[in-house]
A protein has these predicted regions:
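Short, small/polar-rich loop/turn modules that mediate ligand/substrate recognition or access, typified
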Residues: 172, 177, 243-245
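Residue(s) in the substrate-gating loop at a strand-loop-helix junction
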Residues: 140
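Conserved glycine-rich cofactor-binding loop
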Residues: 16-18
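Short C-terminal tail/terminal secondary-structure segment
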Residues: 4, 91-94, 145, 221, ...
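Active-site helix of classical SDR
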Residues: 120, 156, 164
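C-terminal helical subdomain
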Residues: 180, 188, 204-239, 243, ...
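Substrate-binding pocket helix/loop in short-chain dehydrogenase/reductase
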Residues: 95-97, 101-109, 135, 213
Length: 258
């Protein structure tokens, strides 16, 4: 079991559901103060009601002004920030590259990559003044193996890795660490939806679609969202104090994606 030696002050983007909610729950279970955001007010409020002590803001991570307000609101009640989890992301269009609109490309990059820059930019001074901080960026296993038809998504998530490595070098002298987690096939509504869409496209049942995906994962396994939460807690703990600049797969070793 990983114990946090002190009450961590944590900001998690897109924390209202899915992986973000699982990460929030993991930190709450360790006694952390947690501030989340979500673009959907109904989703956000439902999560806040579900988890005692959780606070949050309605935020479009692709909007720099929204992000400035998010960080300001979180810092006002927490008094600082020890951990930033950049989890917000969208799947973007599913299409051949030549058919992707400029609008869809720009929106995907804006949320998935620019949003992380906005968040890091707005907490950097606070962490520098503290001489400590942990930043965790959520990328994807697709960043390693590519994914035809999803070029904006993959490009944005590869960009996340470059940002992660650069932040680790640039801010390491100030005691700030930065790592990326690369999840695989997540066993939640979104992950199952991906398989359902694949099944419809191929005119096969869900079980056959599942076999098609799992055969390219060495451990033949789904990933539970709570596992990503547990890894994030580990990286933010004293046990992870010398881990920085790393891209860590939580994917059962994805060999290929279809």
């Amino acid at each position: 079991m990983v114990d946090l030696k002190q009450t961590q002050r944590v900001i998690i983007t897109a924390g209202g559901s899915g992986i973000g909610e699982a990460i929030a729950e993991s930190f709450l279970n360790k006694g952390s103060k947690v501030h989340i955001c979500d673009i959907n007010e109904k989703t956000l409020n439902g999560c806040l009601q579900k988890h005692k002590g959780l606070r949050g803001s309605v935020t479009d991570i692709g909007n720099s002004t929204d992000v400035e307000n998010l960080i300001s609101e979180a810092l006002d009640w927490m008094g600082g920030v020890d951990v930033l989890i950049n989890n917000a992301g969208i799947g973007g269009p599913n299409s051949n590259l030549e058919d992707i609109s400029y609008k869809d490309w720009n929106r995907t990059i804006s949320v998935n990559l620019n949003g992380m820059f906005y968040c890091i930019k707005n907490i950097a001074k606070t962490m520098k003044d503290q001489k400590s901080g942990c930043i965790i960026n959520i990328s994807t296993a697709s960043a390693k193996v590519a994914l035809p038809g999803r070029s904006p998504y993959v490009a944005s998530k590869v960009g996340v890795l470059g940002l992660t490595h650069t932040v680790a070098r640039e801010y390491g002298p100030y005691g700030i660490r930065c790592n990326a987690i690369l999840p695989g096939l997540i066993n939640n509504e979104r992950g199952r939806g991906i398989l359902s869409n694949h099944a419809k496209e191929k005119n096969i049942d869900f079980e056959e679609a599942e076999k098609n995906f799992l055969k390219y994962i060495s451990l033949r396994t789904w990933i539970d969202p709570s596992e990503v939460g547990e890894l994030a807690v580990f990286l933010a703990s004293s046990a992870g104090r010398h881990i920085t600049g790393q891209q860590i797969g939580m994917d059962g070793n994805v060999e290929w994606e279809i």
